[in-house]
C-alpha cells in the first residue's frame, strides 16, 4: 500500500485529498504545520508527500530543504502561489513537482503516479552516517562524538547534511551556497569558509589537518568518509 503524507494547514483541502487518495487505495497521514510534517515524515516514512507552502510555522521551501538533508521521498507542492519565481524556488529546493491551486484532482493523481514511478528507480540517502568517532542521524538531527552530543546551528547542520549526502563528490562553492543558503547567496563564498571552519572544529579530530572535510582549492569542498 502506498503511504502519502499531506502537509497542509487547511482542513477542507486535507479532507478532500484524503477522500480522493483513500479512494485510490492509499494510506493517508496528515500534518498541519512544518514541524509536525517533518516529524511525520521521519516516523511514518511515506512514499510521497503533498506539501503546501504557506504553513503557519514556516515556509514550505524550508520544509523541503530540511527534508532533503535525509530523505529523497517525492514531494509534490500544492500551493496557491502561482508565480514562476515561487515554482522555481520550490523545485530548486528539491521538490519533484508543483501544482497551483485551484487544481484538478485527476491531474494531481496523474502527477502523483509519475513521481512514484520515477522514485521507485532511485536509492534514498542513508539517514545514519558514521566517520571517525562521529555518528550523525540525519533524520533525527542528532550528532554524537563518542558519547558526547554535538550541537550544530541550523546552517551548520544543513551544510553537513549536503556534504554527507554527496560523500566523495567534489561540490563547487556555488552548489553549496545555493543548496544551503539559497540562490541569492551564490557570490558570498566567505560564508562557506566560516561554516566549514565551524564543522572542522566540532567534528574533526585535528581541525588544522582535516581528514573528512576537505578543501578542493579553487573549486569547493569534498566530504570523505
Curated annotation (Swiss-Prot):
Keywords: Cytoplasm, DNA-binding, Phosphoprotein, Transcription, Transcription regulation, Two-component regulatory system
DNA-binding region: 126-225
Residue ranges of domain Response regulatory in the record: 3-116
Location within or outside the cell: Cytoplasm
Record keyword Isomerase present: no
InterPro entries: CheY-like_superfamily, OmpR/PhoB-type_DNA-bd, Sig_transdc_resp-reg_receiver, WalR-like, WH-like_DNA-bd_sf
Post-translational modification: Phosphorylated by KdpD.
Gene Ontology BP terms: regulation of DNA-templated transcription
This protein's record includes keyword Transcription: yes
Single annotated GO MF: transcription cis-regulatory region binding
Membrane-spanning residues: none
Alphabetized Gene3D superfamilies for the sequence: 3.40.50.2300, 6.10.250.690, Winged helix-like DNA-binding domain superfamily/Winged helix DNA-binding domain (1.10.10.10)
Residues modified to 4-aspartylphosphate: 52
Its job: Member of the two-component regulatory system KdpD/KdpE involved in the regulation of the kdp operon.
Matching PANTHER family: KDP OPERON TRANSCRIPTIONAL REGULATORY PROTEIN KDPE (PTHR48111:SF50), REGULATOR OF RPOS (PTHR48111)
Name under which the protein is recorded: KDP operon transcriptional regulatory protein KdpE
Taxonomic lineage: Bacteria, Pseudomonadati, Pseudomonadota, Gammaproteobacteria, Enterobacterales
